[in-house]
Structure formats: C-alpha cells, structure tokens
C-alpha cells in the first residue's frame, strides 16, 4: 500500500485516537498526545461527514473536559489545529481552548 505523508499522518492520528477512546471508556484520564489525537480525529471525521469549519471549531471544544485529562494537559493545549479535507477542499480548523 502506497500512502502519502498526509495519509500516514491521518492514519497515525486515527490509531492514537482509538487508544485514547478505549482508555477514556475505561475511566482513565488522557495524557497530552491522547487528548490531541482524540480531538483531531473527531475533527477529521466531522469534516468527512460534511460539517463546516465553524461547526467543528465549536464541536472540538466540547469533546473533553478538565476531569477527563491528566493534570496540566489543558494548560499545555491552548489550541488544536487540524488540516482537514472538506467536500470543497482542504482547510485548517483551529479549536481554541479545546479542554474546558
């Protein structure tokens, strides 16, 4: 299978988000990479579903709360930026303060 660097990145994000989802489901608090992967994958899937950039910016800030991540993670993550493919092309989605 021949994958572009962008496709490899998306596959890595998806794989890391699966680990994060399973840990979250078991009641474990997510660390920094898991939180980033969890939010990023949700944004990528939302773009694939046809949601708008504005919708995803708002949605991304509702995915995780401070209680679901390890101490210090919200402060380490002032924003998440994801380059997502929409029906009309690739756009950068920025979620400010994604963990509230």
Swiss-Prot record:
Q: What is its EC number?
A: 3.5.1.5
**Per the record's keyword annotation, is Cytoplasm included, yes or no?**
yes
Where, per UniProt, does this protein localize?
Answer: Cytoplasm
UniProt-listed Pfam families = Urease_gamma
Alphabetically sorted, this entry's keywords are:
Cytoplasm, Hydrolase
Taken from the UniProt entry, a GO cellular component term is:
cytoplasm
> Annotated pathway, please?
Nitrogen metabolism; urea degradation; CO(2) and NH(3) from urea (urease route): step 1/1
User: What GO terms in the biological process aspect are recorded for it?
Assistant: urea catabolic process
Residues in a coiled coil are: none
| Keyword Chaperone in record | no
Q: Which GO terms describe its molecular function?
A: nickel cation binding; urease activity
Protein name listed in UniProt: Urease subunit gamma
Report the source organism. Answer: Synechocystis sp. (strain ATCC 27184 / PCC 6803 / Kazusa)
The gene name on file is: ureA
């Amino acid at each position: 299978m021949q994958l572009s660097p962008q496709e490899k990145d998306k596959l890595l994000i998806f794989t890391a988000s699966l680990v994060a989802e399973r840990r979250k489901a078991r009641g474990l608090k997510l660390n920094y990479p898991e939180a980033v992967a969890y939010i990023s994958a949700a944004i990528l899937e939302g773009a694939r579903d046809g949601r708008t950039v504005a919708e995803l910016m708002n949605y991304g800030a509702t995915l995780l709360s401070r209680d679901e991540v390890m101490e210090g993670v919200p402060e380490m993550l002032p924003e998440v930026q994801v380059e997502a493919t929409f029906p009309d092309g690739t756009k950068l989605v920025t979620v400010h303060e994604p963990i509230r």
